[in-house]
Amino acid sequence: MMKTEATVSQPTAPAGSPLMQVSGALIGIIALILAAAWVIKRMGFAPKGNSVRGLKVSASASLGPRERVVIVEVENARLVLGVTASQINLLHTLPPAENDTEAPVAPPADFQNMMKSLLKRSGRS
């Protein structure tokens, strides 16, 4: 009598493990988000300035690697502050600025015009 053995083939594992596939997708999504943030910042859609309600930094000058003189507008006064890495000192108090001398606020950029100018610059019309 002859014995025959049946061979059972094991399913082969996919080329990449599920952990590697998920990791690759996550890295791709993060790279896409960073690229979109860079484009938004580069094209000028990001909000300008870091003014807080009632508080606005109107001027700033660097005196050294960690020292600055800053003019801050608060309600009815302008404060001249000395800012270092470890402390902030009030140097002087100025009267409020006149509204006439305030710089005009630029209107928000129009996406269509910005895209046209970008395409013209790159040579694609």
Swiss-Prot record:
GO cellular component terms listed in the entry, alphabetical order: bacterial-type flagellum basal body; plasma membrane
Membrane topology of the entry: Single-pass membrane protein
Superkingdom of the organism of origin: Bacteria
A single BP term in Gene Ontology: bacterial-type flagellum organization
Keyword Membrane applies: yes
Keywords of this entry: Bacterial flagellum, Cell membrane, Chemotaxis, Flagellar rotation, Membrane, Transmembrane, Transmembrane helix
InterPro entries: Flagellar_biosynth_FliO, FliO/MopB
Transmembrane domains' residue ranges: 20-40
Localization per record: Cell membrane; Bacterial flagellum basal body
Family statement: Belongs to the FliO/MopB family.
Protein name as catalogued: Flagellar protein FliO
Annotated organism of origin: Salmonella typhimurium (strain LT2 / SGSC1412 / ATCC 700720)
